[in-house]
Amino acid sequence: MRIQGISGSRGVAVGNVYKYIQEEIVIPDYEVTDDQVEAEIGKFASAMAATLKQLDTIRQKALVDMGADEAAIFEAHMQIAQDPSLSDGIKSLVENSKMNVVAATAQTIETFAAIFIGMDDPYMRERGADIKDIGDRLMRNMLGMNPRGLSHISGEVIIVAHDLAPSDTASLDKNVVKGIVTAAGGPTSHAAIMARKIGRAS
């Protein structure tokens, strides 16, 4: 089989295929009552604290493995996560529309990401994927799902996935992962940028 694509990071890689399928996030479909609003907001606060802690751990790993420029990606993610317009948008949907906090997060993230995805500049379009990465992490923490990641892989492999978030790429063991193939993303994605930094074909 011959598959044609766009190179995100130049090189040749040989290894076993590791198909990475992300666990789907199922958005709960229920409204909250007035007396449940405070608890929903509390879920958001707890998930945010966990998200920031995880992002800081990834930032530290990226700093050691790749350098300050790549670590700065996750510093930016932490800043985006703490943007008042993001948290205010989520809280407003919970308080005024009585949406559960996971559904409110999904809608707010989609709105924010769509702004970037609709831009003409390829680099800015890719930032929409970064926002979705932050939102996915928040929702996974709200739902008690294990953080996704690729740090557990063993053997020499080529990762095949629909897409890889920056946090996915930062968790890779460069001694194990020899190449990356994704259906989405491009040369300006943070995943491609980090693949180039660690010298892996993508």
Language-model regions: role of each:
Residues 1-202:
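Non-catalytic, soluble scaffold/interaction modules
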